[in-house]
């Protein structure tokens, strides 16, 4: 970590989390998730904050998530010099991505991107893929460019990116990931990896060239390790099948699921790419590409040795149960009376196939997202996402505590909120499902209105929220994630459509208001503007005035009010 950055991060950590300095460590900080003084980090390079309550909290937060402002304006912090014209690119890769630059020499360059429509520019880190084909990442406050974070030039379909120093002809195994930074991250841990650039790019041309290197020897194993979002998982299954049809030995690997989605570069920065964890990620990949529910259940049992458990397959809920007596009889029969000569592990696997029962207990898959509470009304709900097979869009809705208390009540509520969703399991099976899901969920605070919440010091609307001068958008789970605060509005009656693009504001409307209503219109406008701060004004001055708009019929009272 660069000394200036280290000094600023340390200063903020001591002030914001009440850490105590103990040798090479910062300890006894207040965990933002559980509020206990169990947070710690390595003082010499405080990249990751971790909670010491492994079983009850186990929070893990990268410093980029805590202080994003320190990882945005790379050109300002590291301007180019005659000695190092690509200082910003170097700093971005070193500090933002956690890479050892000695492994990346001569494979990237610092360039510039200019958006004429927005009249904005930024430095970029550019990686060549082939002659006339390159990809670059915007590094200076990329949020200014909307959804654009990177640029492509040239046709990359069928190709992949690889480190210039990577000798594919010497590899027994090659990982195929989405992003260039993911491939570089795996390279730091001795894993040969190439980048497809996007999950839907099947590298047919690159694989053909690779096959030519292995004409007289065994081809390497392909490990498809795309992102763990919906698109990444769908294409992992698709490309594994296609590559096998093309004559390749193929399997998969998956990053672990977490509320904050992590890619391979994120895991590299969190020191979570050691050999034992890599085995676990390959296990996740095997589960993803399992051909049927039985195969997936057997994989899970062989790893966990649990005799009974629920699992998901194709967005349906299944239940696995092992009949021990039947298993022992099947094992003895296979091991000692079978026609095939099998070792003990092979006999166990075959006995499992004969003695395990897999039953579908719901034709959809319910996932508890979070617990939402209204402290004023003392009401609470569990917010669920219900996934369906066959690409049917998921639905999200609430369950009360009583609706989760028995299988029959759960079935009624599921039928009510999810068309065609049926739960056929028992109350005991539901209890075990909830015991697995509920302890891990977070709590989301709620308001029953839209507007300013005095309690949470935030403006909460339908799709946007503002707190401490920062704008937040509703996330995929229908709440506003504001760091230590998670918040949503329960209001369903008032719907406001707000535009957060300030450059699209039409500044002519005040003139039209003046032409139509004159000074009285501006008095009403000033009052309306003041209502945005009514709670703050009441807090300081004890009250906020009323405004009465009166006039002759047809004088425009309703028009003025509706406009405002």
Task: State each model region's role.
Residues 478-564:
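P-loop NTPase catalytic core of nucleic-acid-dependent motor ATPases
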Residues 1-76, 83-122, 126-129, 208-211:
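N-terminal structured subdomain of primase-like DNA metabolism proteins
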Residues 199-204, 226-236, 257-259:
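Acidic, metal-coordinating catalytic cores used for nucleic-acid/nucleotide bond scission
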Residues 122-124, 208-212, 261-276:
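Short, surface-exposed amphipathic charged segments that create phosphate/polyanion-binding patches used
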Residues 210, 234-246:
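Short, aromatic/basic amphipathic alpha-helical patches
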Residues 34, 276-489:
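N-terminal nucleic-acid engagement/recognition segments and initiation subdomains in replication
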Residues 51, 93, 127, 178, ...:
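Terminal peptide-recognition signature
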Residues 2, 6-13, 116-219, 236:
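Phosphate-handling DNA/RNA-contact segment within nucleic-acid enzymes
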